[in-house]
Amino acid sequence: MATGATKLTAPGPAEPFRVFLLSPADCSGKRAELLQRPDPGHPLGRKLHGGGGAALGEVFSFVSSLYFRGKLAYARAFALPPRGQGGIHVITPSDGLRPPESLLRLHDLRRYAGVPVDAEEERYRRPLLRDLRALAPAWAEAEVVLLGSIASRKYVELLTAVLGDRVLFPSDFVGRGDMSRGGLMLRSVEERRELPYVPLLGAVRRGQRPARLPPKGGEPREVT
């Protein structure tokens, strides 16, 4: 179960507690395969093969590149968890929720690669529901923000089954692809500007692709 980094400062009167759930990286893709090679050239791969492991957030940031890096940076900037609780929880393919600081080893990465992230997959579903139910009481006064895919069932169905209308997502995610979302979150961190959130239940989760992010210091560019 995730614990994550703990913030001890309480929010102001108008600011709610907020925790983030980050969707996992694709552990069966080419970048994940690079880390699993017998003689990995990347320092991160050597950590995994060395037995000591590497931080989950670091591994997923390498595997997913811009998208997960954006999610993790954004969550670190804006998490405001209840006292004694972690503010960032990573959804994993078969270990439920884990903090980004937890150690991932080579056999974990290989195991993740073999488990589909699908609402009907019991190896994914059961651990996630277990951890959501265990943490739900601690989140009674908190907003729970999903940073991940909102268009499919794989996260939406399970999160809302336990947490109901407490689950939110950034409304600016609608219509954007992974790379665009990653860039949007990194831009938000740089500008110290939190995105607006809406409840996941009943929301419009599909839409037209929005305009591209404007260049820094320039005018918005429309999608062509």
Regions found by a protein language model. Name each.
Residues 2-224:
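Peripheral peptide segments
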